[in-house]
Amino acid sequence: MSLQKFIIDIKNFIAQNTDLVIDENPVGFPDTPFYYLFFPEKNVVLHCISLENTVDDATFFQKISQLFAQKDIRVIHLWEDIWQSKRSIVESRLMSIFGKSETIPARLTQVQRIDKPTLDKFLVNNHLQSKVNAKLKYGLFLPNRYFRVIQNEKILQENAHKDAFLVAVASFSNAKKFIRDEQEYRSYELIRFANYQGFTVVGGLNKLLKMFIDEHAPDDIMTYADADWSDGTNYEKIGFERIELTPPLTFELDNETFTRKLADENTKNKVFNSGNWKFLMKLKDDAARD
């Protein structure tokens, strides 16, 4: 099959920024009308989804993910519209996955409350999903005295006049009350978390969560991981429990503008994602549960 331009662009970007070997459409991989780029050194495969092809099975991508999970291979379903519309963010995510992003230790950063415009601007520039309303908003700032750990000269120049550089954000919902097992729970949702493009704040989410928990004493925190990109293993590493894989979402996709919106009964050009992994961090005192 001839390669679409966006797949060639992905290959070129990775070749220019890493020394990883790329195995294309390996024998024995699950059947697909799309294209695989496999990186055996990282045990990662990019499932490159061209808009020229379609699938009618809403669970197709979930099934592909399950088959790769059985092989202990991480699969990323990389859609052409996402690559075209949010390329720099995708490139940053890929570099992080391949261990090529700059790292900043969370211990050098400070947690501060941020306002809605600051959060929204950061998410538009650094998160693949759209910004959403959030009641509680936090940022991780790297103080000027630690700018020496930044290697990117352009970032250094752009922020040299600042007292601190915003390197990550997290947003949370307000509390909702639920009754489970005859106990009342104050539950919050971690809505968004993002690092600044090109950087990974090591321990950043943990530090933001700690501040949030100290300030609000939640009984539990719920969050979701986009199954197109992740199985959410990193959430489990910091204390979240895997609850379920949600059904795929159905979108209406505009092939010209590379934009999506949730589908309705009149949608003709339907596409499906892989759903989301739901996680829960249980914080209520065990004694209170008994």
What is the predicted function of each stretch?
Residues 1-25:
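Acidic-basic catalytic patches of nuclease active cores, encompassing PD-(D/E)XK
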Residues 32-61, 175-176:
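Short beta-strand-loop-alpha-helix junction that forms the active-site gateway
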Residues 34, 135-137, 274-279:
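Short hydrophobic/aromatic beta-strand or adjacent loop that forms the aromatic wall/cage
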Residues 36-41, 141-143, 281-283:
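Active-site beta-strand termini and strand-to-loop segments that position acidic
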Residues 57-86:
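Catalytic cores of nucleic-acid endonucleases
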Residues 72-73, 218-221:
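Short, high-confidence coil segments that cap the C-terminus of an alpha-helix
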Residues 89, 93, 98-206, 210-216, ...:
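A conserved beta-strand-loop-helix scaffold within acyl/acetyltransferase catalytic domains
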Residues 224-287:
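Active-site/acyl-donor-binding loops of N-acyltransferases
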